[in-house]
From Swiss-Prot:
Family, similarity comment: Belongs to the amidase family. GatA subfamily.
HAMAP family on file: GatA
Enzyme class: ligase
Protein name: Glutamyl-tRNA(Gln) amidotransferase subunit A
Length: 483
């Protein structure tokens, strides 16, 4: 049994009692990375020297019994800036970017005394659902190396599933934590928009992006969200909501829970194996005293279209800062200022990023703004209202995290429309801004299936309670890929 088979709480107790040291945990991480990283490719940059340095310091000082995450190894998605540690957003344009400050979540993790093992691979600028658009390399799913780990936080999910780190941070703009968590058989939480500071997150779509934790089990996830949540003066969209002790909500008692299951989430297009795993999960929850009814989120059908217009529009604005003048890649082939802009961006951005910038710029252009951007915003309002309506009568909404299990590498990369439409079950949650968690709920043809539990605004504690109660009745989270 490896050290990462233990939970956060178990490892914390061992550290406090000095049965193990932070150095042991960091060694476990790098030994595992040495043995499997060539196969999975979870990381872009490793932080080996600094990680061992922090581990030695913490070992010498002793672990604070009140600091649950102290001495534990974490991986951080490479769109979250880390001071003096290369941060690339998996793009050529930021290949050698060395930030001069830490993101708020990174500062919070340092205060919690976690140890950063390195920066995790992702789709370039978080644009993708497969971690195939990274400038550096593709990440492979630990359960089947011929398949994708999901995206855009594919490295964050694969590193946890492969046992390279104990837990990780990802970001979720349209499903980028939940879908890879589902594909890799781990737990991923997208918090309520504004629950976690975005300061230091390299922006894709500012009204949709949210940072969240990826872990092996629900309890670990709750501890990590406690550490990174809270109001931040540096992020005007962060919300002044008390940081709850999410870990206190894991009582296992969900008697009387009212579940809404949207008919749109189990409709045509959802793999039969995925649908069956979700129905079996609902039976498990019924045994625990919950009830469920079929409900409708009637405007879900507009989710993907409105999401791709809005997210691409925001991206075209956000990514205009990468111009070759201030930081990042600068084309050596430019002779005029105009050439500097066009060549830097043409050479520095990958195809998918360029596709979305063009789509967004088109949607925002004067002749098309009303027809596309404005209409997408109206659809977003209707989607948000759908959730509000269901939550008047139900505590949580449940469905699959993805309509399929992990697909083959190179299987969809040249078919963007199919890839985009695969986000149908996750993007409405970002458009509405509500929280959702993906937990392992079974297997289909040997590949993990994720159960998506969606809550009302700031109801993360309830999501953890439901997810934990389900997890206690099953063993899916204990299954490990055979690498």
């Amino acid at each position: 049994m490896g050290l990462f088979d233990f939970s956060v709480k178990e490892l914390h107790d061992k550290l406090v009692k000095k049965e193990i040291s932070p150095f042991d945990l960091v060694s476990e991480s790098f030994n595992r990375i040495e043995s499997v990283e060539d196969k999975v490719g979870s990381f872009i940059t490793l932080n080996k020297e600094a990680a061992f340095g922090v581990a030695e310091e913490l070992g010498d000082a002793g672990i604070d019994p009140n600091n649950m995450l102290a001495g534990l190894p974490i991986g951080i998605k490479d769109n979250i800036v880390t001071k003096n540690l290369r941060t690339t957003a998996a793009s050529k344009i930021l290949e050698n970017f060395d930030p001069i400050y830490d993101a708020t979540v990174v500062s919070k993790l340092k205060n919690a005394q976690t140890i950063n093992i390195g920066k995790l691979n992702m789709d370039e600028f978080a644009m993708g659902s497969s971690t195939e658009t990274s400038y550096f390399h593709k990440t492979h799913n630990p359960w089947d190396l011929s398949r994708v780990p999901g995206g855009s936080s594919g490295g964050s999910a694969s590193a946890v599933a492969a046992g390279e780190v104990l837990f990780s941070l990802g970001s979720d703009t349209g499903g980028s934590i939940r879908q890879p968590a589902a594909f890799c058989g781990v737990v991923g939480m997208k918090p309520t928009y504004g629950r976690v500071s975005r300061f230091g997150l390299i922006a894709f779509a500012s009204s949709l992006d949210q940072i969240g934790p990826i872990t092996k089990n629900v309890e670990d996830n709750a501890y990590l969200l406690e550490a990174i949540s809270g109001l931040d003066a540096n992020d005007s969209t962060s919300i002044n909501q008390p940081v709850e002790r999410f870990s206190d909500s894991l009582t296992g008692d969900i008697k009387g829970l009212r579940i809404g299951v949207p008919k749109e989430y189990l409709a045509e297009g959802v793999d039969p194996g995925v649908k069956q795993a979700v129905l079996d999960a609902l039976k498990t929850l019924e045994k625990l005293g919950a009830t469920w009814d079929e409900v409708s989120l009637p405007h879900s059908e507009y989710g993907v279209a409105s999401y791709y217009i809005l997210a691409s529009s925001e991206a075209s604005s956000n990514l205009s800062r990468f111009d070759g003048v201030r930081y990042g890649y600068r084309s050596p082939n430019a002779t005029t200022l105009e050439e500097l802009y066009t060549k830097t961006r043409s050479e520095g951005f990958g195809d998918e990023v360029k596709r979305r910038i063009m789509l967004g710029t088109y949607a925002l252009s004067s002749g098309y703004y009303d027809a596309y951007y404005k209409k997408a915003q109206q659809a977003r309002t209707l989607i948000k209202q759908d959730f509000i309506n269901v939550f008047e009568n139900y505590d949580v909404i449940i469905g699959p995290s993805s309509p399929t299990t992990a697909f083959k590498i190179d299987g969809m990369i040249n078919d963007p429309i199919t890839m985009y439409s695969n986000d149908i079950l996750t993007v409405p949650i970002n458009l509405a801004g509500v929280p959702a968690i993906s937990v392992p709920c079974g297997f289909s043809d040997g590949l993990p299936v994720g159960l998506q539990i969606i809550g009302n605004y700031f109801e993360e504690s309830l999501l953890y309670k439901v997810a934990h109660a389900f997890e206690q009745e099953t063993t899916f989270h204990k299954e490990k890929p055979n690498l």
